[in-house]
């Protein structure tokens, strides 16, 4: 068996659609207000995909930027992983279209449907595949068009979510000398499928006139349960990193952009200042699997990824699933 290799992130990318949907726009659509949304979520606007865009469209933009950042030709990619719950279609995998349109000839591809935790889970899969020597160049995308599964008559969900994509290129660390993967976790609490879900369209509730009439094709969420769960596991994940590495090693925490109030409550529970956290939820809302890679790229652009310091990425969401990835930049 080959020796385990160190793995790094060679390139980062992000893309968000041009159309902006503000809280003021939503005031005209549902019974809500800018004040109500901001107080409860910290969100002021979100992006909405154009009618002629699909999830792979967004991912391809982000993937291309990540490849350019990594100085890697598309044909050198060996594997494409797409984290999404809003793929172009139920099957085949959206990763197949991403790889094809990017020009990743002969690359493998598959999707990971872990919702808000998807990108973090995908980073661990990619890192371990590169570490094992099975692959040298892996592209991981997190992409969502959540606006297509939102009920714009339900103010409890439609104000929270937006569309977007992010991407990262993984390769042996000796070739990129940055973003070294140090480890992470993947966990779940099963039996809570109904807390946050799109009930219709699968084998439990196949698509039918009846399922559409019952609005099962739209996202459903139990907000209070999600809030409590997210605060608890966010705090648990960051505390585990502190126990292993020490708080002084942390340069930035880039969490899943779930809700500003959840992030603030978790940081208060941990006892760390919000200055350590990179947040952009005010601009994009919750973009599920896209939120961490979008924020990671923007943190890079803002100079928040400090050389030699830890980048901690906790994520949590539907399933109920959670996990984290730790990098040393």
Language-model segments: what does each one mean?
Residues 1-51, 154-228, 232, 236, ...:
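Condensing-enzyme catalytic core mediating Claisen C-C bond formation in acyl metabolism
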Residues 30-39, 89-103, 140-146, 203-211, ...:
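Acidic-glycine-rich active-site phosphate/pyrophosphate-binding loop
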Residues 2, 56, 60-63, 67, ...:
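Claisen-condensing/thiolase-fold acyl-transfer catalytic domains that form or cleave C-C bonds
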Residues 131-165:
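Flexible, glycine-rich active-site loops centered on histidine and acidic residues
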Residues 10-13, 83, 113, 138-144, ...:
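Short beta-strand segments
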């Amino acid at each position: 068996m080959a020796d385990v290799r160190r793995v790094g992130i060679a390139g980062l990318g992000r893309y968000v659609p041009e159309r902006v949907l503000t809280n003021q726009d939503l005031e005209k659509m549902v019974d809500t207000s800018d004040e109500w949304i901001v107080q409860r979520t910290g969100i002021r606007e979100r992006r909405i995909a154009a009618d002629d865009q699909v999830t792979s469209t967004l991912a391809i933009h982000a993937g291309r930027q990540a490849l350019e950042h990594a100085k890697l030709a598309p044909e050198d990619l060996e594997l494409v992983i797409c984290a999404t719950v809003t793929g172009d279609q139920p099957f085949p995998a959206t990763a197949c279209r991403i790889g094809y349109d990017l020009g990743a000839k002969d690359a493998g591809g598959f999707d990971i449907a872990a919702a808000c935790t998807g990108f973090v889970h995908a980073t661990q899969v990619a890192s371990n595949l590169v570490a094992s020597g099975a692959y040298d160049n892996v592209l991981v995308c997190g992409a969502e068009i959540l606006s297509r599964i939102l009920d714009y008559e339900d103010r409890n969900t439609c104000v929270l979510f937006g569309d977007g994509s992010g991407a990262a290129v993984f390769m042996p660390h000796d070739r990129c000398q940055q973003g070294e993967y140090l480890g992470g976790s993947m966990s779940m609490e099963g039996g809570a499928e109904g807390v946050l879900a799109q009930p219709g369209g699968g084998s439990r509730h196949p698509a039918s006139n009846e399922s559409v009439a019952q609005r099962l094709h739209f996202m459903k969420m139990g907000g209070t349960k999600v809030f409590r769960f997210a605060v608890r596991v966010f705090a648990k994940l960051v505390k585990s990193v502190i126990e292993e590495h020490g708080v002084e090693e942390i340069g930035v925490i880039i969490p899943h952009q779930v809700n500003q109030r959840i992030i603030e409550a978790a940081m208060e529970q941990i006892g760390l200042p919000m200055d350590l956290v990179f947040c952009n939820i005010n601009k994009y809302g919750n973009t599920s699997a896209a939120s961490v890679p979008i924020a990671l790229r923007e943190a890079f652009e803002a100079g928040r990824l400090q050389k030699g310091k830890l980048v901690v990425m906790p994520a949590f969401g539907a399933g109920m699933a959670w996990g984290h990835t730790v990098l040393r930049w």
